[in-house]
From Swiss-Prot:
The gene is acpP. One of its GO terms (molecular function) is phosphopantetheine binding. The modification O-(pantetheine 4'-phosphoryl)serine is found at S37. The lineage of its organism: Bacteria, Pseudomonadati, Acidobacteriota, Terriglobia, Terriglobales. Residues 2-77 form the Carrier domain. Keywords: Cytoplasm, Fatty acid biosynthesis, Fatty acid metabolism, Lipid biosynthesis, Lipid metabolism, Phosphopantetheine, Phosphoprotein. GO terms for cellular component: cytosol; membrane. This is Acyl carrier protein. GO terms for biological process: lipid A biosynthetic process. 4'-phosphopantetheine is transferred from CoA to a specific serine of apo-ACP by AcpS. This modification is essential for activity because fatty acids are bound in thioester linkage to the sulfhydryl of the prosthetic group. SUPFAM superfamilies: ACP-like.
Amino acid sequence: MASVEEKVKQIIVEQLGVDEGEVTPNASFVDDLGADSLDTVELVMAFEEAFEIEIPDEDAEKIRTVKDAVDYITAHAKGGK
């Protein structure tokens, strides 16, 4: 079973079409990975679906880096899925 970090990286690579090597913990979705506002919304939706969680808009706005996503999902995922 993939770790949360591995799964998050996989989703980012698929959604943004970036190289896996670019997806580092401190990589900003917008500044480093070239995401626009629509991309970030789609990323959050993909995280919600993959990890079976609900991410409120006010929390989604705070998820700006790979580490932010991993930390949020780790704290909120049901049963670590």
